[in-house]
Amino acid sequence: MLHPIQLTDTARRIQAGETPDDDTLLSLIRMPDDRTFLLFPGADLLREHFFGTSVHLCVIRNGKSGRCSEDCAFCSQSVRAKADIDAYPLISEIDLAEPGRRLESTPVNRYSVVTSGRGLSSAEVSTVSRALAAIDTTAVSTCASLGILDPGQLAMLRDAGVTRYHHNLESAESLFANVCTTHTYEERVQTVKAAKAAGLSVCCGGIFGLGETDDQVAELAFALRDLDVDSVPVNFLVPIKGTAMEKASRLTPLRCLRIIAFLRHVLPDKEIIVCGGRVHNLGDLHPLVFYAGASGIMTGDYLTTSGRNLADDLALLATLGMTPREKAG
């Protein structure tokens, strides 16, 4: 186990452009809960070096809910789940665009439309593209998370002004068969590569709390590093009644913080955005995500669960002496 001085020295070497060997990085995620706070100085150093005290804010809209053919064990939208959720087909262009247009006058950086299902038809992608094209992207950048798409569909989004595509790996490859059996891990990897080839930046991360070991946390982090993704959404499982993982063991707040700090050391210059399960899993410790290395948060509601409202998150940033990220436009 590394001494506190060695931990900070590791972060300084990363800051200088060095890449520690994987064994050194593995020692960080393997630390016990009661030593998690020792990772904060290095993680905070790296976050501030690459991102200062500004925080990326993003908001999502569930554009198509439920009735998903896939069997992801954590997901309430799967047809295999018996969760009590609202299910509906793709909503109208106006309803897809309106939340994004309302964000134009707020500090929110990105607005994303997220849909259930393995993927969308080209007609549905066209609807989403037209909706997102109606948003002033100098005021709020647009993203999409529409499942497995082909190059032509990804190009359609790009041509509509969408600059980022979201598609999670969800878990380490060695765990994936326990998470989903209706599509492969490699299909997810290829979708990420296709989005990059289409000229889109990529938001790609996973969900923690699926039963992964420390080494599987590292396996996922190293895969994200190898894919050179631009942004990493970090979700912590909120077990939902009616899903295969409704009785999953709850993550400790300190483990959540250690995962964030580990990711910051592995992916020092990437946007790390804490998304689903932030308050549910971290409770009173959720403001510490920034000192653990997070450079962004998702604000507002999630797909089928509620989140914190924007006003509360802006007040939190002010209390911490942080500011919303300046808009790209």
UniProtKB/Swiss-Prot annotation:
Q: Which residues bind [2Fe-2S] cluster?
A: S112, C143, C203
* Cofactor detail note: Binds 1 [4Fe-4S] cluster. The cluster is coordinated with 3 cysteines and an exchangeable S-adenosyl-L-methionine.
- Pathway(s) the chain acts in: Cofactor biosynthesis; biotin biosynthesis; biotin from 7,8-diaminononanoate: step 2/2
Q: Name one GO biological process term.
A: biotin biosynthetic process
User: Residue ranges of the Radical SAM core domain?
Assistant: 50-278
Q: According to the lineage, what is the superkingdom?
A: Bacteria
List, separated by semicolons, the cofactors it needs: [4Fe-4S] cluster; [2Fe-2S] cluster
**GO MF annotation list:** 2 iron, 2 sulfur cluster binding; 4 iron, 4 sulfur cluster binding; biotin synthase activity; iron ion binding
What's its top-level EC category? transferase
Q: Which reaction does it catalyse?
A: (4R,5S)-dethiobiotin + (sulfur carrier)-SH + 2 reduced [2Fe-2S]-[ferredoxin] + 2 S-adenosyl-L-methionine = (sulfur carrier)-H + biotin + 2 5'-deoxyadenosine + 2 L-methionine + 2 oxidized [2Fe-2S]-[ferredoxin]
Q: Which UniProt keywords apply?
A: 2Fe-2S, 4Fe-4S, Biotin biosynthesis, Iron, Iron-sulfur, Metal-binding, S-adenosyl-L-methionine, Transferase
Q: What's its EC?
A: 2.8.1.6
Q: How does the record describe its quaternary structure?
A: Homodimer.
Kindly give the HAMAP family that the UniProt entry links to this protein.
BioB
Q: Which family does it belong to?
A: Belongs to the radical SAM superfamily. Biotin synthase family.
NCBIfam families, A to Z:
bioB
Q: What is this protein called?
A: Biotin synthase
Where does this protein come from, organism-wise?
Desulfosudis oleivorans (strain DSM 6200 / JCM 39069 / Hxd3) (Desulfococcus oleovorans)
Name of the encoding gene: bioB
